[in-house]
Amino acid sequence: MRKLIYFSIIFFCFSCDNKKEPIPSYYQELEDLREINDQLIKSNSKDLSSIYQLGISIKNQSLNLYVRYHKNFNDEENEFLLQCAATGSEAAQKYKDAVDYFLKAQRKFPESDNAPVYLHNRARILDNILMDKNNARLAFEELIELYPNHPLSENSKVYLDNVFGKSNEEILNILK
C-alpha cells in the first residue's frame, strides 16, 4: 500500500506540469505590428522618410499576417490588420492600395465603429490626393447612404453641397 501511495504522489507531481502554453508566434508578430503602428501614430509628421519607412513596414507586416493567419485571428484582430494595411499604404504613399484596403476593411466589417472612417478616408484620398473626383463623389455618397447619422456623413453632406468640385476662388467667394 505504501508503494502505491508513493507511486501516486510521484505520478501526481510529474503530471502537474506548471509550464505555460507558449504563445503562438503570430500573436507575437501581431504585438510587434501594434508597436510599429504606435510609432507611426507618434511620429513627427514632418519626418517623411521615417513615415514612409514605417508605412512600408506596417503594410507588409499586416498583409503578411493577414494572408498567413487570418483564420487564427478574431474579427477585431483581422480588422486591425486591414486597417494597418490601409494606413501603412497611405503613409508609404501607395494611395491606390490605401483606397483598396480601406474599402476592404469597410466591406469586411460594415458594423464596426470604424467602418464610416474607412469610407471617409477612402473618399478623402480619392478626392484630395488621387484627384479622382467621380469616384470620390461616389465614395462620399456611399458613406452618407450607409451611415446617415454618423458625424462624418453629416460633414460629407456639407462638403458635397458647398465645397466639392469648386475652385479655390469659388470657395473664397462663398466664405465672403
Which functions belong to the PLM regions below?
Residues 12-15:
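C-terminal motif of bacterial Sec signal peptides marking the signal peptidase cleavage site
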Residues 92, 129-130:
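Structural motif corresponding to the intra-repeat A-B loop/turn of tetratricopeptide repeats
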